[in-house]
């Protein structure tokens, strides 16, 4: 264990020195990526170092209720239904929102009434929620209001990283090259649809129509013909009324993982990996999570050394551009002439052992359990409150 990691573990406020720091692992949530979050949480709960951390697992239902869920309950649920949603649990909990109080509040409900009792003291929260109401700054703001340390990016970085429009604005301001795109607001489509069609035609086909604030490729459609544009827009609008429409780019899809530095040191970038999509027009939800042969993931990517270094440098620039903390995955296109174009940043990437973020760190010498340790240690180094 490094000195910085030891210091991080020792500085958890309120923790009894004779006990291990307690980490609350959060999963589920209200977004369309609820089931993906459960898969991520199962992987983390299997691998987390329980010799170093006490663990409390908290599931959030699709209507936003918080319950204690054991690892065994989660395992049984996913064994019976791989893309499951959480049922209501037996023990409901909430966060205290008074400064200085960090114990979960346990609901004791009976037919005659109920009461709240204090549960476990929480030293850090590991939020494993993907998409809106989890990865977009809303949950991060709640944790800051509750004076709880947490893994990952803060409110502003999470919000920017969830919005495909504003992340591009941040990238451009940092000097990174982004592909051609246009933003379609709700009023644009409702009142001036023909102007939207004209803007898209200027990009040239194919284009990718995307909800601005959704993940796991939900609502994304590749459009090769103008006559298919309207239906793609309506599909995306089911997930978000703000859309980003991007010109198609001919290039290899390359990703790079970023990990924060200890004691405010510079972020670290992994070796990059490559996604080779098979049988799909792009890396969609089915290729990511449903079909075993939907994509081939290669790490490290077979690229010239100078391109690898450029990718790592640009990943750190992108991380800093959104004011990232903890972790992020940066997605790029590398064109046939080795031009590097950033596509997006993901502030809570897929985190199963076969997901690209952990795989890229494993290829860089940091194994899955150690990566989890690093992220929790980084969270414990940060102050409570606004970040």
Q: Predicted regions: what is each one?
A:
Residues 37, 179-183, 206-231, 253-255:
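Glycine-rich phosphate-binding loop of ATP-grasp-fold ATP-dependent ligases
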Residues 55, 149-150, 178, 207, ...:
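Hydrophobic beta-strand scaffold residues
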Residues 224-313, 339-341:
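Phosphate-binding site of ATP-dependent enzymes
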Residues 1-156, 160-166, 173, 184-194, ...:
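ATP-binding N-terminal substructure of ATP-dependent carboxylate-amine bond-forming enzymes
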Residues 171-172, 199-217, 241-254:
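ATP-grasp fold ATP-binding core
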Residues 184, 220-225, 258-261, 335, ...:
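Short beta-strand-to-turn element immediately C-terminal to the catalytic PLP-Schiff-base lysine
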Residues 2-21, 27-30, 50, 302-387:
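ATP-dependent carboxylate activation and anion-phosphoryl transfer catalytic cores
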């Amino acid at each position: 264990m490094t000195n910085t990691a030891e210091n991080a573990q020792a500085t958890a406020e309120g923790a009894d020195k004779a006990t291990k720091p307690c980490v609350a692992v959060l999963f589920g949530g209200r977004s369309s990526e609820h089931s993906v979050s459960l898969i991520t949480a199962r992987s983390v709960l299997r691998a987390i170092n329980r010799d170093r951390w006490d663990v409390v697992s908290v599931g959030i239902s699709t209507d936003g209720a918080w319950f204690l869920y054991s690892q065994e309950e989660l395992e049984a649920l996913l064994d019976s239904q791989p893309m499951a949603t959480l049922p209501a649990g037996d023990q409901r909990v909430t966060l205290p929102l008074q400064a200085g109080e960090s114990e979960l509040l346990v609901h004791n409900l009976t037919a005659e009434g109920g009461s709240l009792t204090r549960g476990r003291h929480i030293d850090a929260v590991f939020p494993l929620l993907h998409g809106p109401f989890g990865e977009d700054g809303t949950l991060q703001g709640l944790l800051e209001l509750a004076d709880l340390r947490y893994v990952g990016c803060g409110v502003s970085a999470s919000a920017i990283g969830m919005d495909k429009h504003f992340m591009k604005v941040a990238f451009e301001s940092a000097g990174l090259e982004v592909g051609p795109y246009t933003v379609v607001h709700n009023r644009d489509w409702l009142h001036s649809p023909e102007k939207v069609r004209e803007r898209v035609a200027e990009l040239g086909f194919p284009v990718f129509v995307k909800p601005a604030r959704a993940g796991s490729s939900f609502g994304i459609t590749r459009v090769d013909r103008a006559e298919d544009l309207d239906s793609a827009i309506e599909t995306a609008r089911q997930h978000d009324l703000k859309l980003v429409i991007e010109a198609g780019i001919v290039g290899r899809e390359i990703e790079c993982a970023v990990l924060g530095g200890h004691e405010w040191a510079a972020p670290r970038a992994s070796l990059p990996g490559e996604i080779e999509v098979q049988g799909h027009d792009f890396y969609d939800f089915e290729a990511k999570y449903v079909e075993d042969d939907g994509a081939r993931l290669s790490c490290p990517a077979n690229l010239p050394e100078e391109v690898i270094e450029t990718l790592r440098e640009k990943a750190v620039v992108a991380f800093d551009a959104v004011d990232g903390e903890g972790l992020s995955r940066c997605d790029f296109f590398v064109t046939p002439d080795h031009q590097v174009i950033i596509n997006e940043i993901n502030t809570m990437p897929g985190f199963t052992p076969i997901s690209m973020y952990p795989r890229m760190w494993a290829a860089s010498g940091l194994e899955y359990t150690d990566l989890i340790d690093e992220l929790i240690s980084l969270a414990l180094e940060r102050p409570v409150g606004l970040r």
